[in-house]
Amino acid sequence: MKFELDTTDGRARRGRLVFDRGVVETPAFMPVGTYGTVKGMTPEEVEATGAQIILGNTFHLWLRPGQEIMKLHGDLHDFMQWKGPILTDSGGFQVFSLGDIRKITEQGVHFRNPINGDPIFLDPEKSMEIQYDLGSDIVMIFDECTPYPADWDYAKRSMEMSLRWAKRSRDRFDSLGNKNALFGIIQGSVYEDLRDISVKGLVEIGFDGYAVGGLAVGEPKADMHRILEHVCPQIPADKPRYLMGVGKPEDLVEGVRRGIDMFDCVMPTRNARNGHLFVTDGVVKIRNAKHKSDISPLDAECDCYTCRNYSRAYLHHLDRCNEILGARLNTIHNLRYYQRLMAGLRKAIEEGKLESFVTEFYQRQGRPVPPLNVD
């Protein structure tokens, strides 16, 4: 992987990630394909929304179908027939969200398989091996996603263990001879001094890119913005910056304003299945009765397959009848909305008009622009 940085506007950056499997224009949003599929979508449909890279879930693909089935096909690309790059998370977030059925040690994490209850162990080395078999174009280190709220002492211990696990991840990644990219993950909760130690330690180990983890886990938006404003300038400028698990459209806008290059989130797909659709002026809840006889498109400014062909009334009807097609059409639209938003942000950065774009984005939704506390 090669990262090319073209231009900046304030702290926002316009560039691209170059892989053997294709080019990803940044800032980029990555749809989430947890089980080897972006829910309800064929790879061709995902590509048609404008997505150039997707995310796969190491933890879930390890449990089902498992490494051996994956290797029978080649790798995850061959298994699911996605031709572009794939980033895989390390499994850390899923393990730590298991709560009471897991035990964290210095060696790794002991837990019960949520499918059948069998005892399982996952550590940095195993995570690197699974992601190697998946053929991930971007591999994420195995870390502890520090929960929120966490006091300073807990956050410090968690961050320090994540640093030790980062080194173990790096060592196993290298010993496997993996030629793809490995990203470090910055932890430290909402504490700037801990984030400083994490960034410094990860840069000393050396990675192809750096993710900001442990945000969007329940902390106030002001804390997320503050940590991004503090951390992003410390990440080497020639490396991509990835904000994990984020988020709402406004979170993407605010991340880009603060220097983030990559995002992922289940929100566009999950919300689509719940009839919660993103449009230029905000959100449409398609199951509301007011859409029953509305023959207008979902979003007159959207060029997606759904908006070009179907009315709000039809989408409302499908949702009320629990038709699978409704969830699919909604997903196509939400994914395209996110990609159109990213394309708009990229163009605004190129033209040096990002803040004008941001102002219009919030004005269309009748909301104030959040403050930006950067030099």
Swiss-Prot record:
Pathway(s) annotated for this protein in UniProt: tRNA modification; tRNA-queuosine biosynthesis
Active site feature: 89 (proton acceptor), 264 (nucleophile)
SUPFAM superfamilies xref list: tRNA-guanine transglycosylase
Pfam families: TGT
Cofactor binding, note field: Binds 1 zinc ion per subunit.
Region span, RNA binding: 245-251, 269-273
Cofactors: Zn(2+)
Keyword tags: Glycosyltransferase, Metal-binding, Queuosine biosynthesis, Transferase, tRNA processing, Zinc
GO MF term set: metal ion binding; tRNA-guanosine(34) queuine transglycosylase activity
Nucleotide-binding is among the record's keywords: no
UniProt record, GO biological process: queuosine biosynthetic process; tRNA wobble guanine modification; tRNA-guanine transglycosylation
Residues that hold substrate according to the record: 89-93, 143, 187, 214
InterPro entries, per database record: ArchSynthase1/Queuine_TRR, TGT, TGT-like_sf, tRNA_ribo_trans-like
Superkingdom as given in the UniProt entry: Bacteria
Reactions accelerated catalytically: 7-aminomethyl-7-carbaguanine + guanosine(34) in tRNA = 7-aminomethyl-7-carbaguanosine(34) in tRNA + guanine
Sequence positions that bind Zn(2+): 302, 304, 307, 333
EC number assigned by the record: 2.4.2.29
Known function: Catalyzes the base-exchange of a guanine (G) residue with the queuine precursor 7-aminomethyl-7-deazaguanine (PreQ1) at position 34 (anticodon wobble position) in tRNAs with GU(N) anticodons (tRNA-Asp, -Asn, -His and -Tyr). Catalysis occurs through a double-displacement mechanism. The nucleophile active site attacks the C1' of nucleotide 34 to detach the guanine base from the RNA, forming a covalent enzyme-RNA intermediate. The proton acceptor active site deprotonates the incoming PreQ1, allowing a nucleophilic attack on the C1' of the ribose to form the product.
Quaternary context: Homodimer. Within each dimer, one monomer is responsible for RNA recognition and catalysis, while the other monomer binds to the replacement base PreQ1.
Protein name (Swiss-Prot/TrEMBL): Queuine tRNA-ribosyltransferase
Taxonomic source organism: Salmonella typhi
Highest classification ranks of the organism: Bacteria, Pseudomonadati, Pseudomonadota, Gammaproteobacteria, Enterobacterales
Gene: tgt
